[in-house]
């Protein structure tokens, strides 16, 4: 079982990051391949980068560094994404990562019927926390849900620890509840009997 952890747990709190605590709760019983976006220093795609990647796609020459993150995402059995709830969605580093993994011919492909997913993952779990409370149609959550459909990942789950700054006197209780949900999802999603060797 190959689990990919996309870590965008950017916080002034450092190791006291609330989103990171959610992620640690879920991941404590499994080894995951860790992509730390805080240290990766990805750059947004430029026209030149797109031309290069499109050229590789046309020639079928995948394996270049430019699509390495996309191949890593495509090959995972399960994906965990951790990011704080910022400005109604998530930090810019995560959006730039999405540009790098959304590679035609790697994580998805087109034919006459439209786009089709190419990812092996059975599920993607989005873990997030924020000072405010959850709203219906949260942009970050909806974005990942749509990406799962595009990448062919059949199951999307999310846990949001919200209200942590709006009601600081209840923040510990809110975190405990969210960590409980993350732990329950770990027991369900990380059942190794469901994954091939």
Where are the regions a protein language model picked out?
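Cofactor-binding loop segments of dinucleotide-utilizing enzymes, especially the Rossmann-like FAD-
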Residues: 8, 37, 127-130, 161
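Hydrophobic/aromatic residues located in beta-strands of well-ordered beta-sheets
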Residues: 3, 32, 123-124, 156
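Short histidine/acidic/glycine/proline-rich micro-motifs that form metal-
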Residues: 9-14, 130-134, 165
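Short secondary-structure transition/capping segments
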Residues: 72-88, 128, 153-170
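Short, glycine-/small-residue-rich phosphate/pyrophosphate-handling segment
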Residues: 110-153
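Conserved nucleotide-sugar donor-interacting segment of glycosyltransferase catalytic cores
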Residues: 101-113
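Glycine-rich phosphate/pyrophosphate-binding loop and the adjoining helix
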Residues: 135, 141-197
